[in-house]
């Protein structure tokens, strides 16, 4: 299983957004991360428990705490769609 780190693409496996992809933007502590869908899907920028995420092998190069615009640009550059 890939590591939980900034820029990692993940699939939400619990809650009403289950099945949707998101990008990990920041690591809050050992249990929570900040995720976003960068306006490309219905996932809003929010705190999420890492137990509710399944990390994927894809990763984009973004700084910690990147804005949605930076995330969207990095996704387009890498050719990854959410």
From Swiss-Prot:
The keyword Zinc-finger does not apply. InterPro entries: KOW, Rib_uL2_dom2, Ribosomal_eL14, Ribosomal_eL14_arc, Ribosomal_eL14_KOW, Translation_prot_SH3-like_sf. Keywords: Ribonucleoprotein, Ribosomal protein. One of its GO terms (cellular component) is cytosolic large ribosomal subunit. Pfam families: KOW. Signal peptide: none annotated. Disulfide bonds: none annotated. One of its GO terms (biological process) is ribosomal large subunit biogenesis. GO terms for molecular function: RNA binding; structural constituent of ribosome. Belongs to the eukaryotic ribosomal protein eL14 family. NCBIfam families: PRK04333.1. This is Large ribosomal subunit protein eL14. It comes from Pyrococcus horikoshii (strain ATCC 700860 / DSM 12428 / JCM 9974 / NBRC 100139 / OT-3). The gene is rpl14e.
